[in-house]
Design a protein with these regions (language model features):
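Active-site mouth loops of central-metabolism enzymes
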Residues: 1-7, 55-66, 122-136, 214-227
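Catalytic-face loop-and-helix region of soluble metabolic enzyme cores
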Residues: 182-230
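Hydrophobic faces of well-ordered beta-strands that scaffold small-molecule active sites
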Residues: 1, 24-26, 54-58, 83-85, ...
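Glycine-rich, proline-tolerant flexible connector loops at the mouths of alpha/beta enzymes
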Residues: 21-40, 89-98, 153-163
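Glycine-rich, positively charged N-terminal anion/phosphate-binding segment
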Residues: 6-15, 19, 32-50
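Conserved, mostly hydrophobic/aromatic
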Residues: 24, 75, 144, 148, ...
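Alpha-helix-loop-beta-strand connector modules within alpha/beta enzyme cores
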Residues: 36-56, 100-121, 166-180
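Conserved small/polar residues in nucleotide/adenosyl-binding loops
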Residues: 232-234
């Protein structure tokens, strides 16, 4: 299927198949406006050619209701009916559309337009960057769940204690759906620095910072140490 992208992605997916993952999620970016050309074909390939359950990301801040409805039909036609419903990042200088200002708006629309879809929501153990505080953030998260999310997946984090604290607060708020932890191994220094710059709300514990400094000029050892820490993290 030539539409699914470059050979590196296909080879990586073939390797993953041997691990029998519970699912693979397919990302989408607001910067390209090309969900139909990238996300849908790749999700189709994973779901049908590789027989791995697939979740399609759907950031909607720059999409109209008509575009989202079309995307849902295209995904449904290839048997992909699990969605990670996202507002999506706002692009500096590009005015968002008004149909989906919040992820909750998208979740409510999907429930009405395609009730057979399983909707997953995003959550932020260390707080959404746009939220004034964690209490407000968890209140908004409860709205997502009430709107129709069957489960939640977290933004990546490196401090387990902050995740456990977040879980406890969600329980107190009446959020009773499964919360899946987002784990990303540190594989190289540039990746880690880029993540910290992009996700300014994320706390990097001292042990993670220590390996970045210790193996600054030894990329192979940094990769090995990053993977080992991720296994402990899990």
């Amino acid at each position: 299927n030539p539409a699914v992208g470059n050979k590196k992605i296909l080879l990586a997916l073939d390797d993953m198949k041997g691990s029998a993952p519970h699912f693979i999620s397919v990302t989408a970016s607001n910067n390209k406006y090309n969900i139909k050309e990238t996300t849908v074909p790749l999700a189709d390939h994973i779901q049908n050619d590789l027989a791995i359950p697939t979740i399609a990301h759907l950031p909607a801040i720059y999409l109209s209701k008509e575009k989202v409805a079309d995307t849902l039909r295209e995904l449904d036609a290839v048997g992909v009916n699990r969605i990670l419903a996202l507002r999506g990042d706002i692009i500096p200088g590009v005015e968002p559309l008004k149909d989906f200002r919040y992820a909750t708006d998208l979740i409510e629309f999907i429930k009405a337009e395609a009730p057979n879809f399983d909707i997953i929501g995003a959550c932020y153990p260390e707080g959404h960057p746009d939220s004034p505080n964690q209490i407000s953030d968890i209140q908004n998260l409860k709205k997502k769940v009430d709107a129709g999310c069957s489960s939640l997946v977290t933004q990546l984090f490196f401090d387990n204690e902050r995740f456990y604290d977040f879980q406890d607060k969600c329980t107190l708020a009446g959020i009773d759906v499964p919360i899946y932890a987002g784990i990303m191994p540190i594989l190289n220094r540039n990746q880690a620095l880029r993540l910290l710059k992009t996700c300014e709300n994320i706390h990097l514990p001292r042990k993670f910072r220590a390996i970045l400094d210790k193996y600054e000029h030894d990329p192979e050892s940094l990769r090995a140490a990053g993977l080992a820490l991720s296994l402990i993290h899990i």
